């Protein structure tokens, strides 16, 4: 929509990190690699958002271990700063989904926003009832329509749970086997997926709003090798 004077009215685009900081993330430097990768992605997110005249990018972050909590409220990308998180406790993914569902309601979300981008990063198995939390998340309109991406940090991550979060058989969880691949995947989701959300398919004759109305490009191919540590 164009405002009087020719200025374009931007629509909110929420980008939300959902980060596993359970005790197993201490192993093999996983939590340090995650902190580094997100910090590295911030300048790329800023450049991408500056080229997108349609979206007002807001970044927030939710961590889960024993319980779940918001650690960063929705923040404009040019003001966003990542503070390193520590790993300890359980893997209460269901609690994270319940917290997430609360902010994806309308309100506080607006009806005319762009599809949110939800990025789940985890290295293990949920220790609570994640199914009820996921059901609640998907019962919210923006929970269903969100672009949901999951990144497995190492071979021990529960790929079935991460696939259920995505909810689309045409896309699979991304498997990061080392710090380098984690950094590449986080950069990809921070830039390419952000841009895709800001350009949803204009019209679909039979689109019913039940899933995200967005085409997502393929992620980068990463070949396993001797540097794999997870």
Label every model-predicted segment.
Residues 1-16, 21-32, 105-112:
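Acidic, polar low-complexity linker/tail segments
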Residues 13, 23-56:
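…and closely analogous acidic/polar surface helices at protein-protein or active-site interfaces
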Residues 18-22, 34, 61, 100, ...:
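DG-centered beta-turn motif at the end of beta-strands
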Residues 49-50, 138-146:
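Arginine/glycine-rich "motif VI" loop of SF2 helicases in the C-terminal RecA-like domain
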Residues 54-84, 159-167:
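Short beta-strand-loop
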Residues 69, 79-115, 127-129, 149-161, ...:
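Von Willebrand factor
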Residues 135, 154, 179, 197, ...:
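Extended acidic, low-complexity intrinsically disordered regions
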Residues 155-204, 208:
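Von Willebrand factor A/integrin I-like adhesion domains
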